[in-house]
Amino acid sequence: MEVQAVLGMILLFHPERCSKKPGEKVRKSEFQKEVLKKVYQATPYPTWENKIDIGILISLSPRAVDIWFQNKRHINKGKNQGVDEAVESRTIDLQTIMSIVESTLRY
């Protein structure tokens, strides 16, 4: 519950963090890419709610996070021919996402 409150406060005080102009390409910082890679290792199929939370924490729109995961899965599909991955979304809790972000900040 506390973590949800923190996310709400971040979004409330910085609504521009998740906004961009339509059609504008989102350039990701090294920090953002590192967080996305670590979350991908935890689950290559995060739920939409997870994507919203990740987006708030690293200043990307949920759609930009979604596209990044789609592209990463597509790239890995070519590398992992014959490896069968489950297609369903896997929820990871917000605490896990927060600890990934915190560990990346220290990195």
Curated annotation (Swiss-Prot):
GO terms for cellular component: nucleus. GO terms for molecular function: RNA polymerase II cis-regulatory region sequence-specific DNA binding. GO terms for biological process: cell differentiation; regulation of transcription by RNA polymerase II. Its main location: nucleus. Disulfide bonds: none annotated. Residues 21-80 bind DNA. This is Homeobox protein HD-7. The lineage of its organism: Eukaryota, Fungi, Fungi incertae sedis, Microsporidia, Unikaryonidae.
